[in-house]
Amino acid sequence: VTSTTITLGESGWFKIATVVMPQATSTAVIKLYGGAGFNAGSPEQAAISELVLRAGNGSPVGITATLWRRSPAAANEVAWVNTSGDTYDIYINIGQYAYWLIAQYDYTGNANVTLHSTPEYSSVQPGNSTSGQTYTIYSSLMKPTAGDVGALPITGGQLNGPLSIGTDNALGGNSIVLGDNDTGFKQNGDGILDTYANNQHTVRVAPGEMMVLGA
C-alpha cells in the first residue's frame, strides 16, 4: 500500500488517478481519508472514501468502478474515461474544501495506479466519462431512511399487498390477518369491508348497511 496526500479545493469533479487495468483481470483500490471541510467539532468531515476498480473479462472490454462512502463529507460519485487500451482516467465528485487528504492505493501485479497530487478540476462531470456505482455504508453517522431499506416511515405510508400479524396471509388482496392466516379483514370492493374467521365470511360492512353472515 502506497500513501500520499492530495488537495481537492473546489466542489466538483477531479481526475485523481490514471490507472492501467489489463482485462481478465486486474484490481486497484484507492482510499481517501478526510473529506469536504475542516471545521472543528464536525466529525463527519473526518471521512473515509473507498474506490474499488475491477477490470472485466475482455468481452466486453472495460472496467467496473465502485465508490463506498462512509460519511456525508466523503466523495459523492466516481466516473472514468478510457483514454487508450487498458488505460483509464479516474474521476471523483466531492464537496468544497477537501484539503490535505491522505490517499492510499494498491493494485495487483499486472496493473498500475498513478495518483495525481494536484488533480485536474471540472465543475461538471466530463462529457465522455462513464459513471460508476456509489454505495453508502450505513452507520450511526449515516443512518438509512425508511425508503432506503424499503420500510414505511413512522409518519405513515402505503403498503402494497396483504399484511399479516404473527402468521402468513391466506386471505390475499387488500387484507389484514391477525394470529390466524385466514382470520381478519379484507377490502372486497369499493366501500366494502369484510370480516373473516377461519376463512368463513362472517360480516360485511358497506355504505349504509352491515350484514352478519352465517349466524
Show which residues each predicted segment covers:
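Short, surface-exposed beta-strand/loop "edge" segments at domain boundaries and coil↔beta transitions
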Residues: G37-E44, I92-D106, N169-L171, D182-G184, ...
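Surface-exposed ligand/attachment interfaces on beta-rich extracellular proteins
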Residues: V1-A46, P72-W80, I154-G156
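A signal for long, low-complexity, Ser/Thr/Asn-enriched, surface-exposed stalk/shaft
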Residues: S71-A74, T83, T87-A151, I192
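Fibrous stalk/shaft segments of extracellular and virion attachment machinery
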Residues: V1, Q133-L178, D182-A215
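Short, flexible beta-strand-to-coil junctions
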Residues: L8, K31-E44, V52-G56, T83-D86, ...
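Residue-level detector of short, conserved catalytic/binding motifs and their immediate flanks
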Residues: A28-I30, Y88, T183, L193
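Terminal beta-strand-rich extracellular "head" domains
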Residues: L53-S71
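Short, solvent-exposed coil/turn segments at beta-strand boundaries
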Residues: A24-T27, S84-T87, L159, P207-E209
